[in-house]
Curated annotation (Swiss-Prot):
Protein name: Nicotinate-nucleotide--dimethylbenzimidazole phosphoribosyltransferase
Species of the source: Phocaeicola vulgatus (strain ATCC 8482 / DSM 1447 / JCM 5826 / CCUG 4940 / NBRC 14291 / NCTC 11154)
NCBIfam families recorded: cobT_DBIPRT, PRK00105.1
Gene name per UniProt: cobT
Family affiliation: Belongs to the CobT family.
Entry's Gene Ontology BP terms: cobalamin biosynthetic process
Amino acid sequence: MKNFHIEYPDEGLREALIDKINNLTKPKGSLGVLEDLALQIGLIQQTLSPTLSHPHNVLFAADHGIVEEGVSKSPKEITWQQLSNFLHGGAGVNFLCRQHGFKLVLVDSGVDYDLPYEKGIINCSVGRGTHSFLKGPAMSMEEMELCLERGAKITDMIHADGCNVVSFGEMGIGNTSPSSVWMHLLTGISLEQCVGAGSGLDSEGIRHKYNVLKQSVDHYAGDGSAKDIIAWFGGYEMVMAIGGMLRAAELRMIILVDGFIMTNCILAASKLHPEVLSYAIFGHQGDETGHKLVLDAMKVRPLLNLGLRLGEGTGAICAYPIVVSSVNMMNEMDNFAHASITKYF
């Protein structure tokens, strides 16, 4: 079993960071969220001069047994087909990774297909998709622990490559369903408010999806612990992302959080280790029903609101230039004393 030892960032540098930020050549607070990010990143890295190095987008992919209950508009083969598209550079996440200088890492967490691992997909498969959680647990506790361990190892790999800032993405037809159930059970928000259109369900489809998820929750026979809820309803790619996030926090890396799926992954991660949220920057508020509610429940502020609902890490990557600006502010702006400017506030 993988044990994580995550600490909150040391607060000893807080006053020095605030002093540096307040003495840059600008009115106090005038760079808003950039100043908040600079403080957070400075505390994570324990420095007055933070850096961003070798950004990676780790994309975990897996299939979901709940799809057999008709909860998704898209057939499950889209999972492997899109993974092939990622491999060949033709997806939304690909152009954004190219544009913003991210290295894309593709991981098979449990896709129900024979994938071409020799072409660059990392084989971390735990199985050929989860079971339908309408009928019982999606995965065993042993499988959940294996996912956490393998996700952590992927983070170790990119950290060894010099990465100190990582976004996590996902591909898994049906994965808004486990996300909605996690959100409901881990926050107490009504299930109806947590269920949305996913990849494009109409109102009738959303109602059917809700009914399936409601039956699944009603039939839940676990112990109610966070780990049990994660395993009973989760997806392999989602739990692997949790492992990746927890290890990233343990290594004091910056975690860029993407959309509805990944927000619920870090919600789940925070139920295991609350400290992980100190390392998280929330990239955007997506268009999926429930995303704003779960962000509000976690009391976090996303950087962007662009109506995105693609996943893959795309929203987190779109927000990255704002993170870069916050670091550049700390390293490139002059202070009042050095610039011989009277402090005017």
